[in-house]
Amino acid sequence: MSISQNYMKDKLPKHIAIIMDGNGRWAKKRGMIRTEGHKKGVETLEKILKYSDKLGIKYLSVYAFSTENWKRPKLEVETILMLFNKYLKSKFNDFMEQNVRLVISGSRERLSKSLNKTINEITNKLENNTGIVLNICFNYGGRLDILESIKKTIENGEDITEDNISKNLYNSFIPNPDLLIRTGGEFRISNYMLWQIAYSEIYVSDLLWPDFDEKELDKSINSFYNRDRRYGNVEE
């Protein structure tokens, strides 16, 4: 029996953020090159997006490419960029049919003109969709997100306050994550949504991202469901 059958939907996390870790290790364990792991990871994302939508999750954020990932081997970086461009183009019709709204969080500065064009065209066409919001964090870093927000706040002539910094972050219309999932068994945040996850519940899965499935997502949500979120208050 799935989570959706066990629990009331108003008790489920509205926003799940995922650090999709383990693609390279998954490939290495199978004697493949790292890029094959990224290709398999794309398939996992499609599966988890559909299941999250089925459960009634409103927002799904995924850490696809960090500002630090440019340091990886050139072939791997080029493959990730190619896969991302291909993913956006190939999934457009599915996203439109499934009423998925796609947004991209991150810096555009190092991305090619063709990739930026694809991002702008696809996200603009999906902007009015009212279903689950898929937030792909690409060329993203939590520190950069905060830094850019502070710069924008100053440029707008606004006071440096928590509210103003929050509203000037990438895609700030998305509420803070209720649940942060990291796959691959590592207990690290890796510069992901540093501002937004201040009070998020964290679940670390030992499964590598390509092996992550609906059952494991159920386990993570079950863990969230059974926690007492106090936001700094004491238990009564």
How would you name each of these model-derived features?
Residues 1-236:
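Flexible, compositionally biased loop and terminal segments
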